[in-house]
Amino acid sequence: MQYDVNKIREDFPILSRSVYGKPLVYLDNGATTQKPRCVVESITDEYYSVNANVHRGVHFLSQQATNLHEASRETVRRFINARSISEIVFTRGTTESINLVASSFADSQMKEGDEVIVSVMEHHSNIVSWQLQAARKGIVLKVIPMNNRGEL
């Protein structure tokens, strides 16, 4: 399958910007991702029409927001072919997700002296999550180095 990069870029309004006279390229997706137009429009629509606490109220807007939230969980489940919506956990971002995985895995599966191996190429949030678990539980963190050719 071949993708039309220019067509995809059109879906991301921020990528229409130029930086130093060249089209913007954004690769720091471990920190935050740029949102396609449909996501920005959907978030804006939510703020304008159904903004309320999810699972925290019995009033109309809260119920509507909760229904939309749970419908999105089902959409994600189908998209990634998960068996159940209980497998879908929404977090604020990658760092929180990695912290949650590292903490829950360390608590349920690891003991002092167990090893976790990461590469030097990991995003900072993944390294820090495991450093915290190493300090907390006595887990041994090993880092795979990279050679001069960028290989592990």
Located regions from the model:
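Pyridoxal 5′-phosphate
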Residues: 1-152
